[in-house]
Regions:
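Bacterial N-terminal signal peptides
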Residues: 6-16
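Juxtamembrane cytosolic interface motif at the C-terminal end of transmembrane helices
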Residues: 17-21
Length: 147
């Protein structure tokens, strides 16, 4: 009986740890001539996890958040160790606004208009590439449907 309980406990811990360690789907996006390899957070659990607990991210990698509805979504940086910039996008992938975010803060960074997507990149990535509000992120149409 103790072996069964131990095995059940290990199985439960594995299931609880799985979302944080699970591979998210990836998508290739473009911003002007710049290629982005983005993990896709299309369900509630992956949107809540986001980039929490990450210690590093490659220069042209990011995370695309796919929301079920266009709203004035907000992001924060609780348990996020990387300084990030977030671009809020409309349904066609047009950048509404870009916000810089500091690690481990709970300040809200919100879309200035209803957004269907948010793209998080290393802090300063958009500014460094000359990417500004009004420009379009390509490849958004290939993103999975939100859940």
């Amino acid at each position: 009986m103790p072996r069964i309980l131990f095995a059940a406990g290990v199985a439960t811990l594995s299931v609880l740890a799985a979302p944080a360690n699970a591979q998210m789907p990836r998508i290739e996006l473009t911003a002007g001539f710049h290629r982005i390899e983005a993990e896709v957070a299309a369900d509630q659990a992956s949107r809540m996890q986001g980039l929490m607990m990450r210690k590093s991210m490659a220069a042209n990698q990011g995370m695309l958040f796919v929301f079920p509805q266009a709203e004035r979504h907000c992001m924060w940086m609780r348990n996020t160790f990387l300084p990030l910039s977030v671009a809020f996008l409309d349904a066609e992938g047009r950048i509404l606004n870009i916000e810089d975010m500091e690690p481990q803060t709970e300040d809200n960074h919100c879309a200035t208009a209803p957004a269907r997507f948010a793209l998080e990149m290393n802090k300063g990535w958009f500014a460094g590439k000359g990417i500004k509000p009004g420009q379009r992120i390509g490849g958004i149409e290939k993103s999975p449907r939100p859940q």
